């Protein structure tokens, strides 16, 4: 089993949901933040970090049940800023980093294991694994330690920029189902994924 670090991005504002923390959206009675970690923890990560931003105070108690937390004090700068903060916080001797998004309710252990299986098959040949479905890039993504160091070496660069600039180092994998590209941005997405807002 390779050493895997896992980074969960949960800093967004959820503006198109009326300003609601996506990590608290409920699926089958469980918050999305918890659902992710309950699945991802089965990979037995050597390090687990949740990046918070908007709604940090509401999400932190939940996140701390599964991971360390770090806060992006300027989440309005966008996802790439949260990624860099998370990358810089890594302290373990990991081989691979899996970066997940809190608003992907269809991501389960099956999808995560599929990514890691591909990563192991091409060990040493590429520096990143990106799932795709019908030509659309998805998440989570997997980076090697070398890729993480390369992202951090360029100020203000996020993972997306590095992936775009280094296609020869990236394996884009066509996946058989939509789980990797489904996320939650609008009320329509909420209905599609059968999610609800907690009133607690």
Specify the residue positions occupied by each region the protein language model found.
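Hydrophobic packing residues within well-ordered alpha-helices of enzyme cores
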Residues: 17, 59-63, 115, 151, ...
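Hydrophobic residues at beta-strand termini and immediately following loops
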Residues: 27, 70-72, 131, 173, ...
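Conserved N-terminal catalytic core of the sugar/cofactor nucleotidyltransferase
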Residues: 33-96, 110
């Amino acid at each position: 089993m390779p050493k895997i670090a896992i980074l969960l991005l949960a800093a967004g504002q959820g503006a198109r949901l009326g300003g609601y923390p996506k990590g608290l959206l409920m699926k089958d009675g469980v918050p999305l933040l918890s659902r992710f970690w309950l699945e991802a923890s089965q990979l037995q990560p050597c390090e687990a970090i949740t990046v918070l931003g908007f709604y940090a105070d509401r999400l932190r108690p939940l996140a701390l049940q599964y991971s360390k937390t770090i806060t992006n004090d300027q989440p309005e700068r966008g996802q790439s800023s949260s990624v860099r903060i998370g990358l810089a916080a890594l302290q373990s001797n990991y081989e691979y980093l899996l970066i997940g998004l809190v608003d992907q309710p269809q991501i389960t252990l099956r999808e995560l294991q599929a990514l890691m299986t591909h990563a192991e098959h091409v060990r040493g040949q590429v520096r990143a694994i990106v799932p795709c479905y019908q030509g659309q890039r998805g998440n989570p993504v997997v980076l090697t330690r070398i890729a993480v160091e390369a992202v951090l070496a360029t100020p203000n660069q996020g993972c997306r920029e590095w992936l775009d600039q280094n296609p020869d180092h990236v394996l884009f994998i066509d996946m058989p189902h939509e789980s990797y590209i489904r996320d939650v941005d609008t009320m329509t997405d909420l209905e599609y994924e059968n999610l609800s807002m907690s009133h607690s």
